[in-house]
Structure formats: structure tokens, C-alpha cells
């Protein structure tokens, strides 16, 4: 009986020691998997290995994820032993700015972020037409704005120079009633003066012969001095039937005076016609 009890106790001890051995085997497998993962990561490339080695917390998380995936795939039918991980508050790697959850705050750049400038440069080199079109559009807008500003500045300078020179710009608009009336009166005065001078020219040309005859008959009266006095000469014109009075200061009108009178009357008539 004592032997049987001793054998039972030994078997119980063996059974109690068997699960720790299984757990030790599982931890050994996990370590082997992590070593294999590290070797694969080192074989990927020098750039990736340098980035991962610079971030030990990321390496630890990758190891943990790979070990969990391997255990889930190989030992899905076996109950996995629970593994205790440190909390986020106690894990200094998770609190550090270089952790995977805070890559945006870290000073180091990942491979994707490093590749972004190179991709932008390749895009610019690959499509120069789009870049040239954008630059041409910007240049055209800039040239248009510069031309508008230059025209505005030239207009302002012209207005300021006109004000300094005393010139007032003509205001185009409807004429007032007073202005129209004044223009009409001036036109009437010019027409009346032109009509008088024209009549004087016609009468002087027709009565020139009569005046010469009267002057020859009145030669007896020429003994008197006429330098300081004026002499009135009347001549009857048969065509018109009225007398024309010529007021002569020093003498009769000559041909040169008639020519100047005709030219002046012609100019006045032309001005009245234009008005």
C-alpha cells in the first residue's frame, strides 16, 4: 500500500511539472521566431535595417506582432498561455516620442516619408508640360496685373499734369439754355456784321466811278485844306435809287482798302457759315 501511494505521488509530481515544460517549449519557439524575423528584416535592405535599429520600440512591437501571428497560425488548436505585457503607462517606449504611435512627433523620418520628396521630384520631371502650363498661367496673370497698374498710373499722372498746367478737361454733356442763347446771339451779330461789310463792298465798287467824276468837278473846292477836317461826299446810284454817304477823313478809298475790306468780309462770312 505504501508503495502504491508513493508511486501515485510521483505521478502527480510529474503531471504538475509537465505544463511548465510545455510553456518553456512555447517560449523557446517564440524566441526562435523573433530571431528569424530579425534575420529577415536584416536581409530586406540596409535602409530598412537602419530605420528599425534606430527605433527599438518599433522593433519590439514588430517582434510581438510576428510572434502572435505565428502562434495563432501554428497553434490554433492548442490553448495558448497568457502573456503579460507592460501597460502603456509603465512602458517607457510607448511614452517616448519615437514610438510607433507617435511617429509624427519624432525627429526621425520613416521610409515612406523619405520617399515623398523623391516622388514629387520624379512627378515634376515626368510631366514638365503641366508645370510649364501652370508657370505660363501665373506669368500671364502677373503681366496682366502689371499692365493694368501701369495704365492706371499713367492716367493718374496725366490728370495731375493737366491740373498743374492749368488745363481743365472738357466736360462732355448737354449744353445749358443760356449757353445756347449766347451762341445764337453771337452768330446773329457775326452775320449782321458780315452782311454790312458785304453791302459796303458792293456799294463801293459800283459807286467808284461816280465818286471819281464828282471829285473832278469839285476841283475848284480843293483849294481849301482838308487835312484837319472831314468831307462828306454824296453820290446818287441809279440802280438802287438811294444815296450813299461816304465819310472820308483824308481822302477817298483806294484799291488796297477795297481788297482788305473784301478779304475781311469773306472771312466773317466763312466763320458764320462754320458756326
From Swiss-Prot:
Residues 175-200 form a coiled coil. Residues 169-187 have a biased composition (Basic residues). This is Protein ARK2N. Residues 1-50, 63-233 are annotated as: Disordered. The keyword Coiled coil applies. Residues 203-219 have a biased composition (Low complexity). It comes from Pongo abelii. Signal peptide: none annotated. Keywords: Coiled coil, Nucleus, Phosphoprotein.
